[in-house]
Amino acid sequence: MALVSQARSLGKYFLLFDNLLVVLGFFVVFPLISIRFVDQLGWAALVVGLALGLRQLVQQGLGIFGGAIADRFGAKPMIVTGMLMRAAGFALMAMADEPWILWLACALSGLGGTLFDPPRTALVIKLTRPHERGRFYSLLMMQDSAGAVIGALIGSWLLQYDFHFVCWTGAAIFVLAAGWNAWLLPAYRISTVRAPMKEGLMRVLRDRRFVTYVLTLTGYYMLAVQVMLMLPIVVNELAGSPAAVKWMYAIEAALSLTLLYPLARWSEKRFSLEQRLMAGLLIMTLSLFPIGMITHLQTLFMFICFFYMGSILAEPARETLGASLADSRARGSYMGFSRLGLALGGALGYTGGGWMYDTGKTLDMPELPWFLLGIIGLITLAGLYWQFNRRRIESAMLSSS
């Protein structure tokens, strides 16, 4: 038992460093894409939104297949291959002077994520015990926030010189991450049985409760991805400089590093996962409604702060809830499918957000996209409430019988 505990402990440290590299490499590049192509080159927000949505759709929409392959062949080969593929996508992005090149680069980056993301998520479940999983997710989120602000700072600084440097730096970090995994990651099996890929896929698709939960989260992700598209654009417009975007990520990092872990420990003793997820989503939704009417940068940052507070409350609960519903016989497949809501929400959030932003500008109604996003948040909240309430009723009926 002592050896098992030691292996779990070392595995968690490995996951934390690996996660830092992945987050850093991603945020060096992606927050700057909308600034580079919309603000600097004058491309339509819809064109850039399509590129970002394509990356999201490819990575998360095909995640169930990446997870099923990892269930069959193990985590290590999929993680290393996927990270090298993302590095290639970032290198191609440096040459993007036509929309189709940007779309191709984002698709290649997303395909890499399809391969490495589900097995990495499944390893978290494998190496953590259920009672500590929520707090470990909080640590990962704190690291995500710190990596995001450091990555955005590096990317903003490099963008002053050349966008090529931004992309090459992101690619180099993912090559480093691939080497780290190839050298040190043991040949873990992420599921308790090594079943054919089709069996893992069908096991997930037959789990109606899990499928409903994942698809309901589409609306949640439509709100969440605006951190990468519309919020940076609005911050840049009000500030008059892309350098101000880094302060948006600095707010997230400061809130996450100071509040995320203690808030997770406090709330897990007092509220259910479902209550924490819905409360966080409600805060995120209400904070988006007024953004289109804001004319001062300080006020905008205040509402972005509220948005992040909602995310800090909701995210650990969302991850832990999804992990608790996963079948240990097909962890990779479950974690891959769990990203489908992010795929749909990301694709709709990016493309729809870009279209709504352009339409709002054309109609001289800057509040339009934010109002529509708020409505989507309320509809999602109602869907989650119905789903969780029905589950409680079914559990009560089973226990009484």
From Swiss-Prot:
Belongs to the major facilitator superfamily. DHA1 family. MdtH (TC 2.A.1.2.21) subfamily. GO terms for cellular component: plasma membrane. It comes from Yersinia pestis. SUPFAM superfamilies: MFS general substrate transporter. It is found in: Cell inner membrane. The keyword Cell inner membrane applies. GO terms for molecular function: transmembrane transporter activity. It comes from the Bacteria. Pfam families: MFS_1. This is Multidrug resistance protein MdtH. Coiled coil: none annotated. It is a multi-pass membrane protein. Keywords: Cell inner membrane, Cell membrane, Membrane, Transmembrane, Transmembrane helix, Transport. The chain crosses the membrane at residues 13-33, 34-54, 99-116, 139-159, 165-185, 214-234, 243-263, 277-297, 299-319, 340-360, 368-388. The gene is mdtH.
